[in-house]
Amino acid sequence: MGRKKSCHVHNAPSDDDIMFSQDHKPKRIYQLWPGNNRFYCGGRLVFGPDASSLLLTTAMIGGPALTFCIRMVFLIGKRYPLFHSLILLGALLLTVLDFTFLFLTSSRDPGIIPRNKEAPEAEGLDMITQSSEWVNNKLGNTKIPRTKDILVNGYTVKVKFCDTCLLYRPPRASHCSICNNCVQRFDHHCPWVGQCIALRNYPYFICFISTSTLLCLYVFVFSWVSMLEVHGKMLLMVITNDLVFVVLILYCFVVVWFVGGLTVFHLYLICTNQTTYENFRYRYDKKENPYGKGLFKNLYELFFARIPPPMINFRDWAPEEPDEEVGSIASELDRTFGPRGDKYDMEMEIGGCKNSKVGLQLHTLEYDNNNSSEETVKKKGVSEETAAFYIPGIQEPANITRNSSIDVRSR
């Protein structure tokens, strides 16, 4: 007897299937992050939205430093080669350090706080005193207090609710309107580095502005020394014969007042354990500072304490978002059949109610194109009240209000 040959027909994927698979490729968190940050090297480098300002900062530092180094190279061949070689080496070292601290400040996660998808419920909040000012969350179903009071080192500190990130900001945290993130121990957003200055990059920022001040003073002093050494001590002859050193001296004299003043101001903030935001807003120099620990402990906390790891790993794979229809059905079932706090995930089959009849019924329910919705219900043994949430044609149960958020569509 001849054997029948079984032939399998393999259909080539259509363009719609290809586009669907491309759209549903897994993505990393940095690719879906709702903030305004710029990510490079696969999410390893986190810049602010105004990172282009780094070009101006680099030019303002590198231009004078490079000019000074080139001038020193010409002086090495004329007289005192060892002396000018040491000056050149010191200038190169300070310039490299300055750019290193600039890069570490601008490309580092400053301490971004993860966002919530839903606002906390007002009745579940543990607070000392409740604010009289209330705010609607994004769902518009409940109201929560805009502020709450917590204890920090024996002091009562008021923390605010962030309408964008849907969370109560931790103490000393604030929402940066430029980066659109809540940031830990927020100091300020620096336009010169194009990044928020906060918990995880503040030590590098201090090193950056301190090194910039030292570089300005270094170029200023040794430009004078080299100029007087080469051209003598007559000021008029010096100015007319070496305009390069004159321009460097004037430039560094102007810049050092700004960057040097900024360095002194932040050294004061470090000694008193304040941030720029707190200094301008709360004026802790005129009242008790709940974060002050004394001079030496404040210095130790900044320069020697371990920098905490980031709260978000932007290179992690982003969790797949459930379908909106499935999510609305699950939430409605949870509110109707399950006790408060019990949750069931229809896709992952996990939750606090693993043996729930609703979960088992949803798991075993299948749609049959050849049978009607009523036949499917009878076949699978699903009650009409349960089936009304996800099967068209079944009458809506009486205990569900008409303004339900469920969106049931015909399959």
Curated annotation (Swiss-Prot):
One Gene Ontology MF term: protein-cysteine S-palmitoyltransferase activity
Keywords linked to the UniProt accession: Acyltransferase, Cytoplasmic vesicle, Lipoprotein, Membrane, Palmitate, Phosphoprotein, Transferase, Transmembrane, Transmembrane helix
Tissue note: Expressed in flowers and pollen.
Domain DHHC stretches: 160-210
Record-annotated active site: C190 (s-palmitoyl cysteine intermediate)
Any one of the GO CC terms: cytoplasmic vesicle membrane
Residue numbers of Phosphoserine PTMs: S405
Record-annotated membrane-spanning stretches: 56-76, 85-105, 205-225, 245-265
Protein name, per record: Probable protein S-acyltransferase 2
Source species of the chain: Arabidopsis thaliana (Mouse-ear cress)
Designated gene of the protein: PAT02
